[in-house]
């Protein structure tokens, strides 16, 4: 079902099947729309554009992460030039002139929704699409409340990872579609079969060898802290234990929640790069920063890994901008071409850096802050991916890996995640986070009926650490 107006060829047969299923769901009498949950890199965007051509509607709103507004607009203009598209940035607080023809499609970032007044909420939309729809999984946020309030006949959620932390997330996303919470909780399997379409790269390769992606080799690089790092980590970890131990004795911890979060942040900073911790404490105490002069096992290892493959482009996903600064400085000293995207890089500047990386030298490195560029980027030019520290959710890392390991990739992709190991007397928070990932991956696997998700991030230690609370993380 490739519409004649679509200026590209759909990959047969799965994208044809996807467009057919979506078109039928849009015409369904009960809760038109649903979840398109194809694995990262299988073309959810082009399938959605094709569906809009098959079932044309006057007013479609697409809500996306801020970092990929431009990409959506570009893809629509490229693949469906017959459609009118308008990027709403929220700055002028108004839609196109009322005297002008209303655009077929409005693309807006999630970040504009909570601002008041938001004209998007005043329009009766024919179709609302949430790309990376897991962004609204918390029902208490303004973004979720406003998305729920949007007036629309058809509602879509696009996400390769629609469940992050618990079954509640799935129930919340179903509620956006209009499906009652009680029904979702009682009939999860029925909901999945009727409203969720998910295909994986492995599934497609079994039916068509031409669609088989090259191998993705994922391994943890387990590191031991150098003596100076271990000494600092022990000190900060012990302080965190004291904070958690003290607060856990209180009847209510709400008023001291920030202390708990800061305790976790500080140990993560030490494990990422000790200078981050020293700078953070100096800022908090309004004192002069102390310079860390004792090296970093993680930074040294990352440089060695990058230098050992001088003919392969690499993506390096980071958590903190200070960490990115250190990596960038080290790479520049080694005369390695380096580009970066963090939360401060937007619009044309972002697209320019992507273009520079794509056309750059074979040993180019792209530094990406995982929350700013972990979704929506097509970077098949890279064949090596480095994750400098584990993320809370496995989905975040899967999204990042999917920037390189996706349709159009012709070479094997190597993924290395750097993680500090610990010991019984001094547990590693990074190892605890990986065990938390395992629990969340099981939830995704259950709801999407995809058991492979349980092991999609391999080499998680078999000895389970039930890190449901900071008390468990700090071994209190």
Each PLM stretch: what is its role?
Residues 1-9, 13, 23-32, 45-47, ...:
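SF2 helicase/translocase NTPase motor core
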Residues 41, 111-114, 134-137, 162, ...:
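Catalytic acidic motif of RecA-like/P-loop NTPases
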Residues 47, 54-56, 209-229, 251-366, ...:
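Conserved Helicase C-terminal RecA-like lobe
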Residues 107-112, 121-122, 142-152, 157, ...:
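Inter-lobe coupling linker of SF2 helicases/translocases
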Residues 115-117, 166, 324-328, 366-383, ...:
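SF2 helicase motor core recognition
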Residues 124-125, 172, 377-390, 414-417:
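A short beta-strand element within the Helicase C-terminal
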Residues 392-401, 405-476:
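A conserved SF2-helicase RecA2
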């Amino acid at each position: 079902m490739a519409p004649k107006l679509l200026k590209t060829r759909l990959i047969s047969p799965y994208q044809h099947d996807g467009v057919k299923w979506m078109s039928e769901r849009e015409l369904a009498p009960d809760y038109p729309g649903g979840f398109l949950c194809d694995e990262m890199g299988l073309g959810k965007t082009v399938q959605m554009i094709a569906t809009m051509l098959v079932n044309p509607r006057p007013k479609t709103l697409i809500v996306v992460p801020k970092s990929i507004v431009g990409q959506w607009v570009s893809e629509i203009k490229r693949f469906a030039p017959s459609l009118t598209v308008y990027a709403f940035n929220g700055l002028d607080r108004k839609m196109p002139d009322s005297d002008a023809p209303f655009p077929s499609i409005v693309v807006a970032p999630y970040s504009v929704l909570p601002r008041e007044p938001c004209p998007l909420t005043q329009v009766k939309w024919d179709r609302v699409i949430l790309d990376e729809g897991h962004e609204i999984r918390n029902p208490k946020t303004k973004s979720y409340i406003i998305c729920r309030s949007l007036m629309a006949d058809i509602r879509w959620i696009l996400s390769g990872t629609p469940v992050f932390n618990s079954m509640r997330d799935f129930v919340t996303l179903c509620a956006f579609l209009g499906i009652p919470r009680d029904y979702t909780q009682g009939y999860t399997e029925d909901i999945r079969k009727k409203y969720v379409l998910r295909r994986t790269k492995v599934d497609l390769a079994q039916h068509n060898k031409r669609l088989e992606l090259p191998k993705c080799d994922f391994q943890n690089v387990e590191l031991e802290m150098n003596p100076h790092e271990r000494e600092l980590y022990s000190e900060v970890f012990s302080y965190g234990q004291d904070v958690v131990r003290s607060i856990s004795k209180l009847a209510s911890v709400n008023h001291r929640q920030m202390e708990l979060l800061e305790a976790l942040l500080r140990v993560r900073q030490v494990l990422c790069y000790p200078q981050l911790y020293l700078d953070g404490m100096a800022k908090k105490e309004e004192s002069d920063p102390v310079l860390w002069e004792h090296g970093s096992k993680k930074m040294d290892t990352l440089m060695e890994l990058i230098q050992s493959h001088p003919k392969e482009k690499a993506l390096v996903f980071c958590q903190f901008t200070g960490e990115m600064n250190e990596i960038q400085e080290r790479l520049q000293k080694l005369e390695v071409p380096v580009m970066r995207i963090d939360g401060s890089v937007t619009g044309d500047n972002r697209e320019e850096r992507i273009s520079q990386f794509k056309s750059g030298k074979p040993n180019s490195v792209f530094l990406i802050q995982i929350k700013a560029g972990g979704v929506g980027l097509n970077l098949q030019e890279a064949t090596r991916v480095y994750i400098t520290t584990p993320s809370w959710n496995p989905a975040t890392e899967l999204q990042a890996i999917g920037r390189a390991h996706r349709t159009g990739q012709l070479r094997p992709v190597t993924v290395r995640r750097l993680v500090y190991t610990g010991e019984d007397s001094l547990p590693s928070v990074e190892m605890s986070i990986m065990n938390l990932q395992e629990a969340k991956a099981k939830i995704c696997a259950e709801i999407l009926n995809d058991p492979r998700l349980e092991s999609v991030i391999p080499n998680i230690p078999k000895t389970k650490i039930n890190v449901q609370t900071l008390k468990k993380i700090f071994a209190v």
